């Protein structure tokens, strides 16, 4: 099993609002500066229809799981060199786990 903390939905919601909401949505399939995060778990990188990804994101071919998101969110530019995402990352493991929990719960909701 993974070493990812369980995550807290409410704390993750706060992290999302502070660090992600400016560029991403999780409650629709729309894109903003970044692609929708709704349904990201289980999706292959660079595949949201209508979003203009960098070649790096398209070519990475990673399937987003809790584990891959946990690693990615630590340092996006290290995980996918050449990504257009300007976010520096979340250094605290608990914040990454909380954010993943929030995205997971919100993605389970019907649109």
Curated annotation (Swiss-Prot):
Q: Which UniProt keywords apply?
A: Acetylation, Electron transport, Heme, Iron, Metal-binding, Mitochondrion, Respiratory chain, Transport
**GO cellular component, as recorded:** mitochondrial intermembrane space; respiratory chain complex
A GO biological process this protein is involved in? mitochondrial electron transport, ubiquinol to cytochrome c
Query: Could you tell me which residues carry N-acetylserine?
Result: 2
Q: Which InterPro entries match?
A: Cyt_c-like_dom (IPR009056), Cyt_c-like_dom_sf (IPR036909), Cyt_c_1A/1B (IPR002327)
Gene Ontology MF terms? electron transfer activity; heme binding; metal ion binding
Its PTM note reads: Binds 1 heme c group covalently per subunit.
Binding sites annotated in the UniProt record for heme c: 20, 23-24, 85
The record's Gene3D superfamilies line, in alphabetical order, gives:
Cytochrome c-like domain
**The keyword Translocase is annotated on this UniProt entry:** no
Residues crossing the lipid bilayer are none
Entry-linked PROSITE patterns:
CYTC (PS51007)
Enumerate the subcellular locations listed in this protein's record, separating them with semicolons.
Mitochondrion intermembrane space
Q: Which family does it belong to?
A: Belongs to the cytochrome c family.
Please give the function described in this protein's UniProt entry: Electron carrier protein. The oxidized form of the cytochrome c heme group can accept an electron from the heme group of the cytochrome c1 subunit of cytochrome reductase. Cytochrome c then transfers this electron to the cytochrome oxidase complex, the final protein carrier in the mitochondrial electron-transport chain.
Task: Spell out the protein name for this chain.
Answer: Cytochrome c 2.1
Species of the source: Caenorhabditis elegans
